[in-house]
Design a protein with these regions (language model features):
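Function-determining surface determinants
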Residues: 1-494
């Protein structure tokens, strides 16, 4: 399976629109002659269009240079990741490898043909002075058919996709097209093909003070789904983002639990804890492997006695392979789509009507709990103090997530408090990393000793971690005081 990142924009023009001369746009010196192709794509989705509604598009396309199965998933910065697979038989349905990648978006439900898009394409390449392809511009004469309700549409579209060019080039081409009468189209061809059916789904959060809370919770659910495909393939950033989203969602359901059915909310939180645990095994192994690899390579050569880096690399690679296999098994298990389905029922169903004071009381309670837990932790030394600081960190995460809910309505004051909570949380996280790293080093040192290897370097790294941890508390105290200044909390007391 091939994976590519697409950065493109789409434009539509009235009848009679003609592609303007694009030379001079962002370093474009030459525009190639057009090459023509006839493309025929069938888009697959669930009966309630879950894939499209969650930013996914699954199609089997014939014609053109990249015929086959394509799964497109939204990515950071407006880009889209496309997973490509050979076309195979038209009757066989999506290959298992792609089916695994849509399991979150589809909620494990079957996908069937939803729309057909036939497209006559004329494609040109935009070249710089060295003959390098900066972008490809495709003029498409499109005919779509909704394979469920039979609705058909036709339109003319221009698609600009970056190759070796940058966003400035896209902006320059967009300006040239706009001057020629084109309008940027914010939705894909597949969205336009089933627009009437999509209009029947209202995915907006409810109005009123509960709206931002529900909207925030839905964003976390959507982040879980949006990162599923990349996390399934072991992408470090996706695993991290998916884990953070599950944690944010779990904290939100707890902080604002009066908005939803309490029993169902607790059950969903338990399942999110399970998912977060599976993601955490992978992420923690990735982070610890990188952390210790850097620590070993930062030492002078004369202080590295024995094959320390190689041994750690081998063991972490084995641990990561095991954790990744366990994560894939979890995402392949029916428990995972069942969790997402329960989340849909909870978050898309009716929420209790509350006023803003109710929301702010819950935020203040989360903040007070975090403050109290940190003050208690700072009064305790030794291993018990380390455990208490870790618990305080978790409380501040919950407080930060609660405040994030109000950023849209409280504006800059809430954003400032979020930023200061994040700084405090990061310091507490650095301390916890040191605690965990020391335990990992101790465990690996014992194993090295049992295998007859020199353990000096493990002990040295352990001592350095302990020394660094000794400087954490003064920094934590300063960061704590910054979070408690009246200027950053006044808005919560209104």
């Amino acid at each position: 399976m091939a994976t590519v990142v697409e950065r493109e924009r789409k434009f539509s023009g009235d009848d009679g629109f003609r592609l303007p001369d694009l030379t001079g746009c962002g370093g474009v010196v030459t525009v190639s002659d057009a090459t023509a192709a006839d493309l025929d794509a069938v888009y697959w989705d669930t009966d309630d269009l879950r894939l499209l509604r969650s930013g996914h598009a699954l199609r089997r396309r014939t014609g053109g240079h990249d015929a086959g199965w394509h799964l497109k998933v939204g990515a950071v910065g407006g880009a889209r990741v496309e997973h490509q697979f050979p076309a195979g038989s038209a009757d066989a349905g999506p290959p298992p490898e792609l089916a695994a990648l849509i399991r979150g978006a589809s909620r494990g439900r079957p996908v069937t043909p939803a729309a057909r898009i036939v497209n006559h394409r004329r494609e040109r390449r935009l070249l710089d002075a060295d003959g390098r392809v900066l972008a490809e511009v495709a003029e498409d004469d499109v005919r779509s058919e909704d394979l469920v309700d039979g609705a058909t549409r036709t339109w003319h579209e221009v698609e600009v996709e970056l190759v070796d060019g940058d966003e400035e080039l896209l902006d320059a081409v967009a300006a040239r097209l706009a001057a020629a009468g084109a309008r940027e189209v914010p939705v894909s061809k597949s969205h336009r093909a089933v627009a009437a059916r999509l209009a029947g789904f209202d995915d907006r959060p409810p109005a009123g003070p509960a709206g931002p809370v529900v909207g925030y919770a839905r964003e976390q659910r959507d982040a879980i789904v949006g990162n599923h495909a990349a996390a399934y393939q072991g992408d470090e950033d996706a695993v991290h983002d998916m884990r953070v989203a599950s944690r944010r969602l779990r904290a939100t359901l707890r902080t604002f639990r009066g908005l939803w059915d309490r029993r169902e909310g607790e059950a969903v939180r338990a399942e999110l804890r399970w998912l977060g645990g599976e993601l955490g095994r992978v992420r923690d192994t990735q982070v610890m492997a990188a952390r210790l690899d850097t620590a070993v390579h930062d030492l002078p050569d004369e202080l590295v006695l024995g094959p320390v880096a190689a041994r750690l690399g081998e063991r972490f690679a084995a641990d990561l392979a095991e954790a990744t296999a366990a994560l894939r098994a979890a995402l392949d298990d029916d428990r995972y789509p069942d969790l997402l389905t329960r989340l849909d029922r909870l978050l898309d169903g009716p929420a209790r009507e509350v006023d803003r004071r109710w929301v702010d009381r819950r935020i203040r309670r989360a903040v007070r709990r975090a403050d109290a837990r940190l003050d208690e932790a700072l009064a305790v030394d030794g291993p018990a103090g380390d455990v208490a600081l870790h618990e305080a960190r978790k409380k501040y995460k919950a407080a930060r997530y609660a405040v994030e809910v109000r950023k849209a309505t409280a504006g800059r004051p809430a954003a400032r408090l979020v930023k200061r909570f994040k700084a405090l949380q990061d310091l507490l996280g650095t301390h916890q990393d040191s605690v965990v790293t020391r335990e990992v080093l101790r465990r690996h040192a014992l194993r090295a000793y049992a295998e007859g290897e020199n353990t000096f370097t493990y002990g040295l790294l352990h001592a350095r971690q302990a020394e660094a941890a000794g400087h954490d508390r003064p920094a934590v105290l300063r960061a704590r005081d910054r979070t408690r200044r009246r200027t950053v909390r006044r808005w919560l007391d209104r």
